[in-house]
């Protein structure tokens, strides 16, 4: 591959991006009352937003439906050809149909228009032709027209699909803001994602409890405490007083500091080398908050206590890493 070919590829990419940027700039200038009306209709809908589209518009429609659904507007995609063969039963009079068609004359969508009207379903269109059958049948049409496709043959849907996608994103975010949709709301629709884990996962979901919680009593020999730490594998142990309440915590770091001071591990009890009380958290706080406490205090483990200061669990950095909080 020679330098000339490289330059041709770069020029092609720049031309495509430039044309699509211009199409989006033109869309930006057209946003007005029709967009406001579309948002109002979508907010007023008592059911779901049903997105329909054929071909490339269908692919874009699936993404728009997914974005709406994940940002507080219940939505799903229906293939218009399948709608003509039974899937129309998925749509109710309380729903709002968002129909995508660059030409506005897609046969499979036009076929559905009489039924949509008969059922009294709200119809919003997104087309590149405001004089098309679809645009005229809709309560509001969002102009998704473009001056030119990025394809040099002006055939492959490129600029038009970009504009449609951007317009769909604009609708989704406008509705998100109107609904007061929060990061916590977003997390509930993305429980498997990183944000969902940070905003939903609690300490109680990852902490070690019961037999998995390393614990010794005040007066236990240091060697005994080390054996408990080794058995439980958390790099720490909780130290309890005679009432079962937290007296302290002993960690790998405490052991290193004790050895640096020349302490004979065979001659001391845990009381002499533990960190008194130590940092604690409650089980109901977010795991992300526990992580911040660890980072702020440069510690690798936390004891989880109840309202009576009794240890009920423990967790360390590795637990948070495995849970995907870090």
Curated annotation (Swiss-Prot):
Q: How does activity depend on temperature?
A: Specific activity decreases significantly at 5 degrees Celsius compared to specific activity at 37 degrees Celsius.
Against InterPro entries, the record matches this protein to:
CBS_dom, CBS_dom_sf, GutQ/KpsF_isomerases, KdsD/KpsF-type, SIS_dom, SIS_dom_sf, SIS_Kpsf
| Keywords (A to Z) from UniProt | Carbohydrate metabolism, CBS domain, Isomerase, Lipopolysaccharide biosynthesis, Metal-binding, Repeat, Zinc
Reaction(s) catalysed by this chain, per the record, are: D-arabinose 5-phosphate = D-ribulose 5-phosphate
Q: Where does substrate bind?
A: 72-73, 79, 85, 111-120, 145-147
What pathway does the UniProt record associate with this protein?
Carbohydrate biosynthesis; 3-deoxy-D-manno-octulosonate biosynthesis; 3-deoxy-D-manno-octulosonate from D-ribulose 5-phosphate: step 1/3; Bacterial outer membrane biogenesis; lipopolysaccharide biosynthesis
User: Could you tell me which residue ranges the SIS domain spans?
Assistant: 38-181
Positions bound to Zn(2+): 79
Which top-rank group of organisms is this from?
Bacteria
EC main class here is: isomerase
Q: Where are the residues marked Catalytically relevant as a site?
A: 56, 108, 149, 190
Name the Gene Ontology molecular function terms of this record. arabinose-5-phosphate isomerase activity; carbohydrate derivative binding; metal ion binding
Q: Does the keyword Nucleotide-binding apply?
A: no
Gene deletion effect: Cells are not viable.
Q: Which residues form a coiled coil?
A: none
Q: Which GO terms describe its biological process?
A: lipopolysaccharide biosynthetic process
- What's the EC number here? 5.3.1.13
What is the recorded phenotype of mutating residue 85 to A?
200-fold reduction in catalytic activity compared to the wild-type
Task: Please report which protein family the annotation says this sequence is part of.
Answer: Belongs to the SIS family. GutQ/KpsF subfamily.
Q: Do you know which PANTHER family this protein is assigned to?
A: ARABINOSE 5-PHOSPHATE ISOMERASE KDSD (PTHR42745:SF1), PTHR42745
Free-text function comment from the UniProt entry = Involved in the biosynthesis of 3-deoxy-D-manno-octulosonate (KDO), a unique 8-carbon sugar component of lipopolysaccharides (LPSs). Catalyzes the reversible aldol-ketol isomerization between D-ribulose 5-phosphate (Ru5P) and D-arabinose 5-phosphate (A5P).
Subunit composition? Homotetramer.
The protein's name in its UniProt record: Arabinose 5-phosphate isomerase KdsD
Which organism encodes this protein?
Pseudomonas aeruginosa (strain ATCC 15692 / DSM 22644 / CIP 104116 / JCM 14847 / LMG 12228 / 1C / PRS 101 / PAO1)
Q: Which gene encodes it?
A: kdsD
């Amino acid at each position: 591959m020679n330098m000339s070919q490289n330059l041709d590829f770069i020029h092609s990419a720049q031309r495509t991006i430039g044309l699509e940027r211009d199409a989006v700039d033109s869309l930006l200038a057209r946003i007005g009352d029709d967009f406001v009306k579309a948002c109002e209709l979508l907010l007023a809908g008592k059911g779901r937003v049903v997105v329909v589209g054929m071909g490339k518009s269908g692919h874009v429609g699936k993404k728009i439906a997914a974005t709406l659904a994940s940002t507080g507007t219940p939505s799903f995609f229906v293939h218009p050809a399948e709608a003509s063969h039974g899937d129309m039963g998925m749509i109710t009079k309380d729903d709002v149909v968002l129909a995508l068609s660059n030409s506005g004359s897609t046969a499979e969508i036009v076929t559905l228009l009489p039924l949509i009207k008969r059922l009294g379903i709200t119809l919003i269109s997104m087309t590149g032709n405001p004089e098309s059958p679809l645009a005229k049948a809709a309560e509001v049409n969002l102009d998704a027209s473009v001056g030119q496709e990025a394809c040099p043959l002006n055939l492959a849907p490129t600029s038009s699909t970009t504009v449609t996608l951007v317009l769909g994103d604009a609708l989704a975010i406008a509705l998100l803001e109107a609904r007061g949709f929060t990061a916590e709301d977003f997390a509930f629709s993305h429980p498997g994602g990183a944000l969902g884990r940070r905003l939903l996962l609690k300490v109680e979901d990852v902490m070690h409890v019961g037999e998995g919680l390393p614990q010794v009593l005040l007066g236990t020999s240091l060697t005994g405490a080390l054996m408990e730490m080794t058995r439980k594998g958390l790099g720490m142990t909780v130290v309890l007083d005679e009432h079962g309440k937290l007296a302290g915590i002993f960690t790998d770091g405490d052991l290193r500091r004790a050895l640096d001071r020349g302490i004979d591990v065979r001659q001391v009890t845990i009381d002499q080398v533990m960190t008194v009380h130590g940092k604690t958290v409650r089980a109901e706080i977010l795991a992300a908050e526990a992580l911040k406490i660890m980072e702020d205090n440069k510690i690798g483990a936390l004891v989880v206590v109840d309202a009576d200061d009794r240890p009920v669990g423990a967790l360390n950095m590795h637990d948070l890493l495995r849970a995907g909080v870090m």
